[in-house]
């Protein structure tokens, strides 16, 4: 760049910082430009690895969707518990009015410190979310769920009234405000979403998520969570076998997936994941039904090995640290997304 252009650029940058504040614009290579993203674990080791950065990114919009009883709320409550362990403050916007505090405590959530709101309508829920984000005091906000964010006009109207695209416009308007504020305050906003079926789809998947297209565009990470089987103890079903696909990821390559067990009343079977992933990378040895770590046998069968790790948390942490070091050693590609996308302007649901 020649001297005249350099002087003009310096003057422009000075004027921008004077008018809009320091660090409004900067070179990407500056030390003041934060490139490393803070993350919060999902509570599932396999999913943290599938996300490519070790967890969910702070300061971003996240969407978690799937069928009923697939583990969406469980996953978000585990993320809240992990965020609280880091000293973070979290809020739960319970639009479905279905939060179970007893179950939340079982998953490790400190319910005394968790902020909870049960809004009357969608506008109120999103306004509360935006105010909390702008406060700069929160680290994570969960909205459960997008489908329950009913517009005020629909609540005040008659049954059977048509409100075409009202929720989609509400979401689009709210996300335009929340996205920038979330980045500035480094607050993660997680939207739980439900699945609906499109009518008359001949080819491709008829499934779609509620709330229009805006959330698909603004979300940095989209997770598709499904129940793929049952976990049994004898004849009794004690949990779900769950698969989570990373449908979109702006922080690392997308389309990775993780499979893990969710035990009823307990959440993700974290230690079973540690054993499976340990065997995969060779940290944990497996000979027949026996599992071993180093020269020590840790159990016959996975269930006994899990009990051993539960009684020896230091060994479990050591194995997990080796797994994370091995699996997250490669620097992820930045800006990888599932599909080419266009900014949403006008949309209907």
From Swiss-Prot:
This protein's UniProt keywords: ATP-binding, Cytoplasm, DNA damage, DNA recombination, DNA repair, DNA-binding, Nucleotide-binding, SOS response
GO biological process, one term: SOS response
Sites where the protein binds ATP: 66-73
Main location group: cytoplasm
Cellular component, GO, one term: cytosol
Subcellular location: Cytoplasm
Gene Ontology MF: a single term: single-stranded DNA binding
Function description: Can catalyze the hydrolysis of ATP in the presence of single-stranded DNA, the ATP-dependent uptake of single-stranded DNA by duplex DNA, and the ATP-dependent hybridization of homologous single-stranded DNAs. It interacts with LexA causing its activation and leading to its autocatalytic cleavage.
Family classification: Belongs to the RecA family.
Protein's recorded name: Protein RecA
Organism of derivation: Psychrobacter sp. (strain PRwf-1)
């Amino acid at each position: 760049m020649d001297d005249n252009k350099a002087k003009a650029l310096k003057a422009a940058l000075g004027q921008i910082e004077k008018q809009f504040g320091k660090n409004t614009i900067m070179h990407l290579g500056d030390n003041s430009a934060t490139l490393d993203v803070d993350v919060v674990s999902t509570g599932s080791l396999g999913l943290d690895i599938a996300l490519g950065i070790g967890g969910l990114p702070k300061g971003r919009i996240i969407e978690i969707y799937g069928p009923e009883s697939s583990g969406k709320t469980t996953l978000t409550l585990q993320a809240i518990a992990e965020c609280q362990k880091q000293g973070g403050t979290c809020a739960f916007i319970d639009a479905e009015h279905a939060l179970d505090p007893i179950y939340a405590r079982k998953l490790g959530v400190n319910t005394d410190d968790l902020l909870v709101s049960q809004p009357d309508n969608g506008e109120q829920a999103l306004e509360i979310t935006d105010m909390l984000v702008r406060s700069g005091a929160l680290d994570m906000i969960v909205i459960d769920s997008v489908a329950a964010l009913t517009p005020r006009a629909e609540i005040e109207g008659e049954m059977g009234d048509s409100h075409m695209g009202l929720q989609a416009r509400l979401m689009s308007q709210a996300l335009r405000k929340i996205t920038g504020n979330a980045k500035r305050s480094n607050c993660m906003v997680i939207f739980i979403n439900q699945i609906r079926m499109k009518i008359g789809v001949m080819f491709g998947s008829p499934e779609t998520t509620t709330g229009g297209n805006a959330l698909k565009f603004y979300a940095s990470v989209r997770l598709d969570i499904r129940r793929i089987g049952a976990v049994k103890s004898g004849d009794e079903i004690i949990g779900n076998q769950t698969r989570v696909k990373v449908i979109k990821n702006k922080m690392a390559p997308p389309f990775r997936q993780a499979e893990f067990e969710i035990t009823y009343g307990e959440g993700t079977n974290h230690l079973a994941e540690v054993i499976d992933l340990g065997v995969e990378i060779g940290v944990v040895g497996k000979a027949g039904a026996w599992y071993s770590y180093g020269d020590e046998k840790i159990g016959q069968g996975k269930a006994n090995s899990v009990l051993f790790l539960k009684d020896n948390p230091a060994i479990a942490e050591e194995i997990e640290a080796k797994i994370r070091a091995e699996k997250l050693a490669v620097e992820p590609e930045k800006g990888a997304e599932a599909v080419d996308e266009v900014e949403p302007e006008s949309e209907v649901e």
